[in-house]
Amino acid sequence: MKLDYNSREIFFGNEALIVADMTKGSNGKPEFTNHKIVTGLVSVGSMEDQAETNSYPADDVPDHGVKKGATLLQGEMVFIQTDQALKEDMLGQQRTENGLGWSPTGNWKTKCVQYLIKGRKRDKVTGEFVDGYRVVVYPHLTPTAEATKESETDSVDGVDPIQWTLAVQATESDIYSNGGKKVPAIEYEIWGEQAKDFAKKMESGLFIMQPDTVLAGAITLVAPVIPNVTTATKGNNDGTIVVPDTLKDSKGGTVKVTSVIKDAHGKVATNGQLAPGVYIVTFSADGYEDVTAGVSVTDHS
């Protein structure tokens, strides 16, 4: 069968675990401070949603109402070493006077946590392999217990290195949101030139990815040229412009879009009922920056 599959992708290998403090800025957006990289991440266990979904029956409908509890993701992180960033900044441990040891306090700290998963995909058009990352962000993550470990005595068979397992939970953040909605977790996929720019930015200074973070090399929508028109009849508000429902992107792909027409005062207008004047059409698609096109409507002569 000849089917149009997407590009093939695989993800492998964790790296660059970053913890940071997050507060709400004066503009209402997240502000991050005290970025630290945590060394030794081995794996991240399944972050399972513990919230229950309940259906409430009424009349002859079994799901008259459906309610889901608040999202609570629980899982674990495994480390092959526990350094200062993990002990002090996540587990809230107290350093000893001589600087050589740490003791638990039970005062676990809530952090914004981000880590990367390396990825590779084969472009379905060119067949080329493209490297990238899946960026995983937990805006509001808290340990729920001290890190556990298991050690064994060395023998002729050798011994495995000790690994520390840290139980964690993630909840929705009042500050970090996507489209105005609070999220307990978010994942980004970045490829090619954007991935290179991401790595360059990260190497110049640790940062947390956000929904409005702009990276160089992004694939963008190509704004169309909309022909100017006249009204259907003289003196009436019955102008109709040609508004495409698909656009090309900067890579030549075809993208389905939605559009909104606004007049010179920013008021939404209805196609087919356009008065003489200048209009701006805004095109939107998931995963792309909006683009606009101008068009004018003149009165029928």
UniProtKB/Swiss-Prot annotation:
Keyword terms, alphabetized: Viral genome ejection through host cell envelope, Viral long flexible tail ejection system, Viral penetration into host cytoplasm, Viral tail protein, Viral tail tube protein, Virion, Virus entry into host cell
Entry keyword Ubl conjugation: no
One CC-aspect GO term: virus tail, tube
Chief subcellular location: virion
Subcellular location: Virion
GO BP term, example: symbiont genome ejection through host cell envelope, long flexible tail mechanism
Quaternary structure and interacting proteins, as annotated: Homohexamer. Interacts with the tail terminator protein.
Physiological role: Forms the cylindrical rigid tail tube with a 4 nm wide central channel for DNA ejection. The tube is composed of 31 hexameric rings.
Annotated family: Belongs to the skunalikevirus tail tube protein family.
Notes concerning its domains: The C-terminus probably makes protruding decorations on the whole length of the tail tube.
Entry protein name: Tail tube protein
Originating species: Lactococcus phage p2
